[in-house]
Structure formats: structure tokens, C-alpha cells
Amino acid sequence: MKRFIVRAVLILVSFVLLIQLWIFCSLAWWRTHPVETTMFMRLDYWSDSSKPIQQQWRDYDEISDNFKKAVVAAEDGKFVHHHGFDWEGIQYALEKNEKSGEVVNGGSTISQQLAKNLFLYNQRSLIRKGQEAIATWMMERMWSKQRILEVYMNSVQFGDHLYGVEAASHYYFHRSAQNLTRDQAAFLAALLPNPKYYQENRNDPRFKFKKRFTLKYMRYSEIP
């Protein structure tokens, strides 16, 4: 029995280490190569393979600064200053969730969201949050802030089977991400992090509030 337990533990540890090696190798490759698919894209496609995934890579300089500032204002105002985790934001989210009795604020940074999008899934669990933290830690040490924001903008979801700011710009506004206005950039940023719902419910008061908030504060956003 003891031998069986030891063997089971060794197998589990080996499996966990293999996952970390896969994440490390993926991050090393993606330092200089476009990200063509993510775990979220795969899961979305597997849920309905009749619809193609819409996504088109754009380099950092080919994306409007309006959107860069908008997404930082909407999702992670301290993006250029933290090392992957906004501890004050996490504390605020915990207090807000405790008061409401449910999860209404996640407190995740852009780096954490990207780690989840690239490698994990959306269901909340301690195991997923732990793996997300490890992937975020590795990413922040292997990639520059500019690279993190570049990959995030190209891989984040903006609707059903719709990923990346270029595909979203064409879907919602029939223009390239390079030519987004401030209002259009704020609209796209406000879709996050619940794009499938807001894609069909653009009159939701929460969406309108987030768009106004983003428009107001994006002028103060610091981008890499």
C-alpha cells in the first residue's frame, strides 16, 4: 500500500512538472512568435465546431494607442507598475465580494487574465487559480510589459468565436484596429471581461457605465 501511494504521488508530481514545462516552453516560443491559438479559443471551437474562430494577429505598433489606453483603464490601471499581481486590487475585490455574498469582482490583472486565456479554463477553483499564479509569475519574468499587452490584445475574447482586437474592430466597426477612435476603443474595452453577454446586451447599464468609466480615465492610462 505504501509503495502504491509513493508511486501515485510521483506520478502526480511528474504530471504537474510536465504542465509547468509545457507552459515554460510555450512562453519561450511566444516571446518572438505570434500566438495563433489559446486554450480559450480551443474550448470555444470545441463547444461549437460549426463556427470558425475569428482572429487576426496585429503587431503592437499596428494597434491604436486609443485601445491600449482604453483596455488598461478598463482592466488594469496599474499594469505598468506591478509584477503580475495587484495586491491592493485583490484585497479590494475580496472585500467587495464578501460584502455582496458572491463573486462580483475578480481583481485579476491583465497578466493574470492572459495566463488564464492562454493555458487554462474559465471555471473558478483553487487549482486553477494556483496554476494561473504560476503561469503569471513565469510570464512576467520572461516577457516585457509591451509583449504581454500585445499578446493580450490579440488573444482576448470579444464575443462568440471572436478573438483579438483586429477581428473585433472589423466585426463591430468595419475598420482596422489601427484606426479605432477613443469612443470605439472604450466600447471594445467595456466588453471585457463578459464579452459574450455584452455582445447581445449592449444596453445593459453595467456595460454603459463601464464604457463611460473607460472614456473618462483612459487619458490617464500609462502604456508600455
Swiss-Prot record:
Pathway: Cell wall biogenesis; peptidoglycan biosynthesis. Keywords: Cell inner membrane, Cell membrane, Cell shape, Cell wall biogenesis/degradation, Glycosyltransferase, Membrane, Peptidoglycan synthesis, Transferase, Transmembrane, Transmembrane helix. Pfam families: Transgly (PF00912). It catalyses: [GlcNAc-(1->4)-Mur2Ac(oyl-L-Ala-gamma-D-Glu-L-Lys-D-Ala-D-Ala)](n)-di-trans,octa-cis-undecaprenyl diphosphate + beta-D-GlcNAc-(1->4)-Mur2Ac(oyl-L-Ala-gamma-D-Glu-L-Lys-D-Ala-D-Ala)-di-trans,octa-cis-undecaprenyl diphosphate = [GlcNAc-(1->4)-Mur2Ac(oyl-L-Ala-gamma-D-Glu-L-Lys-D-Ala-D-Ala)](n+1)-di-trans,octa-cis-undecaprenyl diphosphate + di-trans,octa-cis-undecaprenyl diphosphate + H(+). One of its GO terms (cellular component) is plasma membrane. One of its GO terms (molecular function) is peptidoglycan glycosyltransferase activity. GO terms for biological process: cell wall organization; peptidoglycan biosynthetic process; regulation of cell shape. It is found in: Cell inner membrane. It is a single-pass membrane protein. The chain crosses the membrane at residues 9-29. InterPro entries: Glyco_trans_51, Lysozyme-like_dom_sf, PBP_transglycosylase, Pep_trsgly. It comes from the Bacteria. Its EC number is 2.4.99.28. Belongs to the glycosyltransferase 51 family. Peptidoglycan polymerase that catalyzes glycan chain elongation from lipid-linked precursors. This is Biosynthetic peptidoglycan transglycosylase. It comes from Acinetobacter baylyi (strain ATCC 33305 / BD413 / ADP1).
